[in-house]
């Protein structure tokens, strides 16, 4: 069992904002461009807002112009589940956190070719950012090595 456990629905309703709950639990999409992490490039780690599980690191984030945070890859493919999404008259690939089953966003094949060609377009409301300087004290010290590997 993972050390990162999703909270109960009641606890999620008490601790998340309405937008965070709607995005993660009801697969809604937050408005583009005005969300918290769209233009956020501080060094650190992005974790699942519902479970705390690490999902993305800042060194894999890039300016895509799509209006939401965009990453070239998750920390590990084992953390992500992909599903076919035919909503809104489109065919897309939905991205969910595998452990908590929280909706994160979508993945597209128009990312930087030199980094694999994928663009993980993720709702800020599904994420919590842990600054690099606070990772150890927040319990994410084991992920500090990812920053050394990516330099």
Swiss-Prot record:
Superkingdom to which the source organism belongs: Bacteria
Span of the signal peptide: none
GN (gene name): msrB
GO molecular function, one term: peptide-methionine (R)-S-oxide reductase activity
GO cellular component, one term: cytoplasm
Active site residues per record: 121
Name used for this protein in its record: Peptide methionine sulfoxide reductase MsrB
Pfam families assigned: SelR
HAMAP family, sorted: MsrB (MF_01400)
UniProt key word Oxidoreductase: yes
The entry's keywords: Oxidoreductase
Catalytic reaction(s) noted: L-methionyl-[protein] + [thioredoxin]-disulfide + H2O = L-methionyl-(R)-S-oxide-[protein] + [thioredoxin]-dithiol
Family: Belongs to the MsrB Met sulfoxide reductase family.
Enzyme class: oxidoreductase
Enzyme Commission (EC) number: 1.8.4.12
Residues covered by the MsrB domain: 9-132
Gene Ontology biological process terms in this record: protein repair; response to oxidative stress
Organism classification: Bacteria, Bacillati, Mycoplasmatota, Mycoplasmoidales, Mycoplasmoidaceae
């Amino acid at each position: 069992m993972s050390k990162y456990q999703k909270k109960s629905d009641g606890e999620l309703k008490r601790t998340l904002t309405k937008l965070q709950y709607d995005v993660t639990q009801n697969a809604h999409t937050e408005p583009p461009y005005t969300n918290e992490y769209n233009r956020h490039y501080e060094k650190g780690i992005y974790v699942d807002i519902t479970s705390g599980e690490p999902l993305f690191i800042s060194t894999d984030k890039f300016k895509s112009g799509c209006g939401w945070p965009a990453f070239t890859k998750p920390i590990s493919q084992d953390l992500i589940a992909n599903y076919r999404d035919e909503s809104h008259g489109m065919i897309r690939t939905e991205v969910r956190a595998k452990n908590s089953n929280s909706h994160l966003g979508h993945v597209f094949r128009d990312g930087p070719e030199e980094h694999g060609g994928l663009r993980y377009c993720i709702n800020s409301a599904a994420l919590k950012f842990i600054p690099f300087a606070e990772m150890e004290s927040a319990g994410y010290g084991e992920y500090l090595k990812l920053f050394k590997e990516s330099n």
